[in-house]
């Protein structure tokens, strides 16, 4: 239960209460409380808990008519309807528009629903009535510290594969141009961490996306990008690429 108190004559008085999906014990593990904003510009609290270490459940709390309300709580189940596979990503303003978006993990077309590599993240905003709207989609490589805002046409049309060696970890995006042929690679993003990373970063076809803690991130446009309807340029990849920062969560001490 979440309580809303008001200050009156120097004392706090309980104004209203609302059910939330997770207990404090559950929130203290991998949970996070985010102070944010709805599409209607109203302030809101986004409370994310993780059930069984696998499912992210987010409640969205806001004042409606002066009463605390859980905008996404199901009257039937008593639990938030904003549930998806946990991907170590929490609500944030993903696109800098001043509105807080909730990450919703979705299986990529043809992907393994239980495999983190095969997941994209849809970012969902809410208004004061609890109406959801998808803002954009990203591919988050949390383990390697980066994410890519998926270009127009990509979310429902790409597969992803991961390759790893001691000094290089690569994520390759493939098109679905033909289900009867092998997947066609479009873009590869590689994290270089070995002693040869500076030399490898400027290998033919590669372009640098960013650097962080001894790691160089590079992109490489592949053959499937050339004639594809949703092809991208190097500059578009750079603009869509971001490093993942460290954030506080309810379980941090």
Regions found by a protein language model. Give the residues of each.
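Beta-propeller fold detector
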Residues: 14-22, 70-76, 133-139
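Loop/turn-rich, solvent-exposed surfaces of beta-rich toroidal or solenoidal domains
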Residues: 38-66, 151, 155-161
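Secretory pathway targeting signatures of secreted, lumenal, and periplasmic proteins
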Residues: 151-201, 207
